[in-house]
UniProtKB/Swiss-Prot annotation:
Record flagged with keyword Transcription: no
Keywords: Carbohydrate metabolism, Flavoprotein, FMN, Monooxygenase, Oxidoreductase
Gene3D superfamilies reported for this sequence: Luciferase-like domain
Native organism: Agrobacterium fabrum (strain C58 / ATCC 33970)
Name of the protein this chain belongs to: Sulfoquinovose monooxygenase
A biological-process GO annotation: alkanesulfonate catabolic process
Gene name of this polypeptide: smoC
Enzyme Commission number, as recorded: 1.14.14.181
Length: 385
């Protein structure tokens, strides 16, 4: 039985996703920059192509002001070089005027023929620090405007930050039906949980102990239930999977064998989410870990020494990692966003050892969002005015 009621209660599969390192986050040794792994379009798109080839169903494309790829530009560039994998594009609310963002999303959704999902983020913009309550209020309004653009004939919004009346939604109609692209969201503060509970579809969590994850799920469900809604749940976690546990643990140690902790701190501080509540929870997990960095069997926190955000990895044999993922599924987790270093190599390890043993799905298809043929939208097969 799941920890809390979930939207896709009858779904017997999981959306298994990989990660494209758009934000200067690919290493052979954590904290040791390698020019061959820089976040160029060529390298990041190679990760996308490898993930699609291996059978991953979605790929997270993050957003940060770092040397690398602009998220939406990158996703657009990948549209013609992919045909099966979905894209989970991060959108930092407030970067773009909301109605123009809705139009941009609609363009991408048509380019990808419904293979678009969105990761709603609310972190600071480069060079400025905004009050958390304001950032989440802004995100709440942006998401509300997006949802109107995708489901109504006009946008009518009278908020504290944005005001629009009677704006036609024709230019912003997405390829996907029944609500538009799915919204994935992660956050731990009361304002974050309220936004997710009221507006989003999938609540994303970073790796902690199973008891802590269950508490996160209960907190998110409480806010969703207050709005008469349910959520699906996702876990973002790194991977180190090998034929044996010993090999996996040795490789985990190898990853951090050249790490200078001061430089690791510098890397963490570069990220826009470095001061967030979620990041503090990841730091706490490192403090509670044993002398080898494990906070729970096979859950290793060493990644977080040189990375903000998601700071732990499942480390183990094929069977151990598969069993851990199955336990998460029993809790009610329906989406896994995975990564590993270097991203091409670890995708191959997971994609050949574990992924073939999992029943996977595309959540937009499971939700009935993706039409079987080009929809009657203004940008699709609808009447042109």
């Amino acid at each position: 039985m799941t920890v809390v009621p979930v939207t896709s209660a009858d779904l017997d599969a999981a959306e298994v996703s990989w990660f494209s390192a758009l934000c200067s986050d690919d290493y052979a040794y954590l904290g040791v920059p390698d020019g061959s792994l820089r976040s160029s379009f060529e390298h990041c798109s190679d990760i996308v192509k490898k993930a699609e080839e291996l059978g991953f169903r979605n790929i997270l494309c993050p957003s940060s002001y770092q040397v690398g790829q602009d998220t939406l530009s990158f996703v657009a560039g990948c549209a013609p070089i992919s045909d099966r994998i979905n894209f989970l594009a991060a959108i930092r609310c407030g970067e773009m005027q909301p109605i123009m963002l809705a139009r941009t999303v609609a363009t991408l959704d048509h380019m990808l023929k419904g293979r678009l999902t969105l990761n709603v983020i609310s972190s600071d913009f480069p060079g400025e620090v905004a009050d958390s309550a304001f950032r989440y209020k802004r995100s709440h309004e942006v998401v509300e405007i997006l949802r109107q653009a995708w489901t109504r004939d006009t946008i009518d919004h009278d908020g504290e930050i944005y005001q629009f009346k009677g704006v036609s939604t024709e230019p912003a109609r997405p390829y996907q039906l029944n609500g538009g692209p799915l919204l994935y969201f992660g956050g731990y503060s009361p304002d974050a949980l309220e936004l997710c509970g009221a507006q989003c579809d999938v609540y994303l969590m970073w790796p902690e102990t199973k008891d802590q994850l269950a508490d996160r799920m209960r907190a998110a469900h409480e806010r969703a239930a207050a709005h008469g809604r349910t959520l699906d749940y996702g876990l973002r976690v790194h991977m180190v999977v090998r034929d044996t546990e010993q090999e996996a643990r040795e490789y985990a140690d190898h990853l951090v064998s050249k790490l200078d902790d001061e430089y690791g701190q510098l890397i963490r501080n570069r990220a826009h989410d470095s001061g967030s509540l979620g990041v503090s929870h990841q730091a706490r997990a490192r403090e509670l870990a044993d002398k080898f960095g494990y906070v729970e069997p096979n859950l290793w926190t060493g990644i977080g020494r040189a990375r903000s955000g998601c700071g732990a990895a499942l480390v183990g044999s094929t069977d151990q990692v598969l069993s851990a993922l199955e336990e998460y599924q029993k809790m009610g987790i329906r989406a896994f966003i995975l990564s590993g270093y270097p991203h091409l190599d670890e995708a191959e390890h997971f994609g050949t050892k574990v992924l073939p043993q999992m029943k996977t799905c595309s959540l937009p298809h499971a939700y009935g969002r993706v039409p079987s043929e080009t929809p009657a939208t203004p940008l699709g097969n609808g009447e042109r005015h």
